[in-house]
Amino acid sequence: MNTRKWKFKQSRSIKVQVTNSKGKFMGKIIKELNNQNIKLNITAVYNAKQTEKILKILNKKIKVIISIFAGRAGDTGKDPVPEFSKSIKLAKRFKNVEILWASVREPYNYLQAKQLGCHIITIPPSIIEKIKKFGKSFDQLTQETVNVFLIDSKKSNFKI
């Protein structure tokens, strides 16, 4: 990487993958940008080992976001919560580091992230709409479901 200083507005950040397409840790680039006091969003992170490698090379001055892909991890049948828990504990030593819950798949992920003390969670609009339903009782859900069944049965024009 060219070691010249980048002219960069402090209100912006650069997104850098944790590894390149060959699986090599991008530590050299992360460290160089971080040492130039450029805010970073380090992305495509999946586990606490990757978080630890990142933290070992950071200065404690400039803001860094570590984006852990919870939904994609869950898609493999693995629970992302233990990795988040470990990563958040590791990051507590750094006031400038925030952990981001990326790749939200379901509304419950919001509660998981909140319970763990995750700093940031990116939530798509479709999930936000579902979060608005939080607090409904199972009885309310039963009645809503039965009403949908009734509407569907009327649309089918079946006679019983």
Predicted features along the sequence, with ranges:
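Flexible, glycine/charged-enriched surface loops at secondary-structure junctions
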Residues: 97, 159-160
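Catalytic alpha/beta core domains of metabolic enzymes, predominantly
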Residues: 24, 30-129, 135-150
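Short amphipathic alpha-helical segments with coiled-coil-like heptad repeat character
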Residues: 18, 121-122, 157-158
